[in-house]
Design a protein with these regions (language model features):
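Compact, glycine/acidic-enriched structural inserts
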Residues: 66-113
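Extended, compositionally biased non-globular segments
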Residues: 145-204
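Long, charged, mostly alpha-helical binding arms that flank functional sites
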Residues: 101-155, 166-172
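Glycine-rich, often proline-containing surface loops adjacent to acidic residues and nearby aromatics
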Residues: 37-40, 73-83, 129-150, 194-196
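Short, flexible loop/turn elements at secondary-structure junctions
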Residues: 16-18, 42-49, 61-63, 84-86, ...
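Single conserved hydrophobic/aromatic residue that forms the stacking wall/gate
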Residues: 1-7, 11, 207
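Long, hydrophobic/aromatic-enriched structural stretches that serve as scaffold segments
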Residues: 9-61
Length: 207
């Protein structure tokens, strides 16, 4: 669904899916099991003011089952990132500081690791340019010696709730700034690059 206001267009998608993995999906996941459950939520906010950046977040959970319907594997994935049309250094610092604060609550290596994955993933290879200024990206986050599945759930919930701390203060500063027709034209070009990434490189849309 889409909600629209004078300030922005907000695209939200949430879903729960049951089914059987395709052969290519089984090969990609390197599993012999095919029964699965997946759920997730995706949020994209496109401000109408070119001085305000695009916000994107995606959070998901995946389970695999054997023939007796026992869970044999489960993991979390997702992230959030920022795509400005015009760079304000303070906004970038603020967004990443919130990302780092959340990560540091769980593991001091998370921010560096997940930021690097975000920079690598959200890259328009055919133009050799970044889609935005990054954020966090993580996937296949399974229970391990330092993080239980409940810990991963708490981490993902914090990422989801971070919209209020990471993004809203930026919008409050930028949504009423003056802009020109030239600024709007540049915004359209950068939105076009955003669409290019989604159509050419985004694995969640390609597969």
């Amino acid at each position: 669904p889409t909600t629209s206001s004078a300030a922005s267009d907000v695209y939200k998608r949430q879903s729960e899916v049951y089914g059987k993995l395709t052969k290519s999906a089984k090969n990609q996941l390197k599993t012999k099991f095919e029964n699965f459950f997946a759920c997730g939520i995706s949020i994209i906010i496109h401000p109408k003011n070119p001085m305000a950046p695009i916000f994107h977040a995606n959070l998901r959970y995946f389970e695999l089952y054997d023939d007796d319907n026992n869970i044999v594997d489960k993991w979390f994935g997702g992230g959030m990132d920022l795509t400005p049309f015009y760079i304000f250094k303070d906004d970038c610092i603020h967004f990443h500081s919130v990302c780092k604060k959340i990560c540091d609550n769980y593991n001091s290596t998370f921010y560096t690791t997940f930021k690097k994955k975000c920079d690598e993933y959200f890259w328009n290879h055919h133009r050799n340019e970044a889609r935005g200024v990054g954020g966090l990206f993580f996937d296949y986050c399974r229970e391990n010696s330092t993080m239980s599945i409940e810990d991963w759930y708490s981490f993902v919930v914090e990422i989801g709730n971070a919209l209020m701390d990471a993004y809203i203060p930026i919008i409050d500063k930028r949504k009423d700034l003056n802009f020109s027709h030239k600024n709007r034209e540049w915004q359209k070009i950068r939105r076009g690059r955003y669409v290019e990434f989604n159509l050419v490189h985004d694995l969640s849309l390609i597969h």
